[in-house]
Amino acid sequence: MELIIVRHALPESEERNDGPADPPLSPLGLQQAEATADLLATEGVDHVVTSTMQRAIQTGRPLADRLGLTPERLEGLKESDYRRSSYTPVEEMDADHEVIREFMDNPLSMFADGYEAFRDRITAALDAVVAANRGRTVAVFCHAMVVGVYLQTLLGLNDPFTVMADYCGITRVAASSSGIRSVRSFNETGHLRDLV
C-alpha cells in the first residue's frame, strides 16, 4: 500500500485563554490545500486520514470532497505541541519568540508528552492505517513533527529535527503488511510554486 503523507497548509496565528490553540488555515493555506487536492485527485487515493486538529482537517477536506470520501480522523496524528495555548507559524517568529527560546534551550521541549511517547503514538497511528488499508493508497494529512519523526524512525536518523516538511509538502512511503517501509519521496512542493 502507499501512504501519501501531507503536512497541513499554512494556518493562522491563534492565542487562547481557554485551552489549546487549534487555528484554522489562513487564506493562503486554503489555496495551498486546493492546489494539493488538484494534484492528488488524479493519483488513485482510496482513503483520506487526518489528525484531529483543524489545520489538518481543513487541508484534507478539498481532496476528500473531490473524491467523495469521508475522512477518518486519528487522535494519534496530533502535532507534538498540541497542548500549547498559542500557535504562530514559525515564519512569523523572531529569535526572541518564546517557542524559539524554549527550542534553543531544550529542543525536546517541542514534545508535550515527551519525545518517545510522541514517536510511539504517531508510529502506532500510521501502522494502524497501513494494517487497515492493505493494497490501497491513503492520503494522510498531519503535521511537521509527525512527518519528521516518522521519517527519522524509518531512516534510522538520530536527530528528530533532521527532516522537516514544508506546508503541503508531500511524502510518499510504500508500506507492506509485513512491516517493510520504503520512503519513495520527501517534501514534494512543485504543486505550490505560486503559493509560497
Regions found by a protein language model. Give the residues of each.
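Short glycine/proline- and acidic residue-enriched helix-loop micro-motifs
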Residues: 97-117
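Acidic, low-complexity terminal tails and accessory targeting/binding regions
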Residues: 72-73, 80-91, 131, 136, ...
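Phosphate-coordination/substrate-recognition cap region in phosphate-metabolizing enzymes
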Residues: 35-101, 181
